[in-house]
């Protein structure tokens, strides 16, 4: 029995449910979808990676799977986000399709394409490769003409379905149309449908004064309303799984009504789904704060988290559980948790039970970007990596030289950890009291005669042996020196930190001195 068959991981459970309910499928289509109305934030990414994990679980069970990601770039441009330039210039495009709005960053063909490209270029870094479907192209090519006709022919039934979850005060009364129309003159959806001939032709008029009759087979102006569009796509793409946010899965929300429309109008059973919760952000640095108009996207998070560690955050948390992605000291804990899970998965750290081993192993498998690596990563705690980088002013080659026993299959992952650590230290959330710079300017710190004498003793007797003493041995020798002076160990160690980094405290002293090395320590203490 394979690990995915024995697994109790939520992605495997969902995959089992899909197979049970859709046993007759030759191919299992799983879908996600986002409107590129602005930066695709990390909360949107939860939908994409949730689908990816279920896709992987299905494939692990030998199923043929198609992963479709829809860009809803034919949605209307409703408002201008705060973090977008050329605000005044964009006002004229409000109420047009997003794909018709020019890119204010002047990098892509359209505003929509700019935001699509941002996430599309980042997803391969976390091992996600969906098939992209651009809804603007689908509508403009007339792909949905027949499905729009079906909706118009069944508009009264759709109206009844929508009203099923509404109270009397909010029921849709009067004439209802399950479509919106983009005027072919002003290109905005400020239109009113006047008539439908029950064949292919729709009559409308616009606030701009334009009006006309359009043939669904020849126009791209007509678009289905959201809940109808969603149901239609399930049928068109044969979708068997698609998650949705908690707002869509509320009682009587868009999923409930889309499910009925899919069943009764398009004759396709609604896909297996689940509700995913919101993502919080904790300890954001100033450059990423909402007050700075910044929306945190996937690339921002990958500045601090290795791809497999970022995946681990989502893999190890049930989708219906809210959690926060941290940029403060919790970053250290998250890396520690991932490292422990990796050690358990590779049998380096003994699990308490078979169940715990299987859980960690499956979480680790699903966290990997390209499947199981050939060997465990070179495990250096993130905190220690940060310290070594700061000692070497961010020089990753110097850090690699410090760990001479690293295997070639471990280098890529370790270098990425170093890059993330240095990003975090510089300007991505590390608190100031965690940061330091070695004092190698030759300027003396004012010290008492007793402390100065102790530093000289350390320089002359301990520093020459720093590279050969173990951390434990060096620590014992430091305490032995401290016992020889009347002020005690606390004052001596504070003085050492002041001399080395200009602060009253820092990394564990013995290990810190070993990383600095004999030559640099001797040079720094020689001014006393």
Swiss-Prot record:
Positions of short motif 'KMSKS' region: 287-291
Catalyses which reaction(s): tRNA(Lys) + L-lysine + ATP = L-lysyl-tRNA(Lys) + AMP + diphosphate
The enzyme's E.C. designation: 6.1.1.6
Principal cellular location given in the protein's record: cytoplasm
GO BP annotations listed: lysyl-tRNA aminoacylation
Chain location of the short sequence motif 'HIGH' region per the record: 36-44
EC category name: ligase
Cross-referenced Gene3D superfamilies: 1.10.10.350, 1.10.10.770, HUPs, Lysine tRNA ligase, stem contact fold domain
InterPro entries named among the record's database cross-references: aa-tRNA-synth_I_codon-bd_sub2, aa-tRNA-synth_I_CS, aa_tRNA-synth_I_cd-bd_sf, Lys-tRNA-ligase, Lys-tRNA-ligase_SC_fold, Rossmann-like_a/b/a_fold
Protein localization: Cytoplasm
Pfam families, per the entry: tRNA-synt_1f
GO MF, any single term: ATP binding
GO cellular component: cytoplasm
SUPFAM superfamilies assigned: An anticodon-binding domain of class I aminoacyl-tRNA synthetases, Nucleotidylyl transferase
Keywords: Aminoacyl-tRNA synthetase, ATP-binding, Cytoplasm, Ligase, Nucleotide-binding, Protein biosynthesis
Xref: NCBIfam families: lysS_arch
Family label: Belongs to the class-I aminoacyl-tRNA synthetase family.
Name of this protein: Lysine--tRNA ligase
Gene for this chain: lysS
